Amino acid sequence: MRSASSLPGVKSIRALERGLDVLQAVQTRPGARLKDLHEITGLPKATLLRVLRTLTERNLVWQRMADGAYLPSSRGRGPARLDDAGRLVEAASPVMARLCERVNWPSVLARPRDGRMEVIETNRPRSHVPHLPIGPVGARVSMLLTSIGRAYFSFCGHEEREEIVRQLQASAEPGDEFARDPAWLARLVAQTQAQGYGRRDPLYAGDPRGAGRFPDDGRDSISVPIIVSGHVVAALNLTWTRRAASVTQIVADHLSDLRAAAAEIASGLEPADEGGTA
């Protein structure tokens, strides 16, 4: 509800009012889509799109790729916390959009939650294969058998890795039983660190031994960690259909693109240098 003007005779700027109404709607209902904002504000969708574009360009709101939702920007709210998922996704989304344009295959961004990796963003809607079964946001996948879980697990700190192992040892989820095999875990970490990326376990990629436990979705993936100030905060994958390319081919063609994207995301989360003179 707008208050009466304290400056009689001075006209308000209607365009600015519309912009502030939309900004307030996004702030009070983060995750609203265009349809929701249309219902909240009563503004025509064409007007809303122009306002939202302006707010986005001014770094006041941003749009999540996975579902088209609009959220208030976290930029300018002080130093980023390493556990701030919203700021992580905000930093990653434009980078993931550009990655998809370069490589044409989709990616997901995920971080650990309760011994699994939870998808928090995907550029699948921007890819040439939007039907590929990855994500959606909120989906949780295996820590030890997926490439994205392996990338996180193998590059995170020793204490965090031990905590993840303890969680998995108490789990009955398929694949988590490997957490009770120290030699298997040691081989996984050593191999992943040596090659510099996580690779999907064959059980998840058509190996007959996985039949009945892990439905074959016809795809494969590789992943790299996102490291901020020496700490792994998430992992980023690249996924494709196996009939289109081998792991060797994807690594040769696109691993450097994936690493560059992870580094760019990390750079956007690094604390600002507040140096100066005493």
Model-found features: residue ranges?
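N-terminal helix-turn-helix
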Residues: 1-89, 263, 267
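An N-terminal domain-start capping segment
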Residues: 7-32, 101-132, 138, 256-278
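Short, solvent-exposed recognition segments
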Residues: 131-215
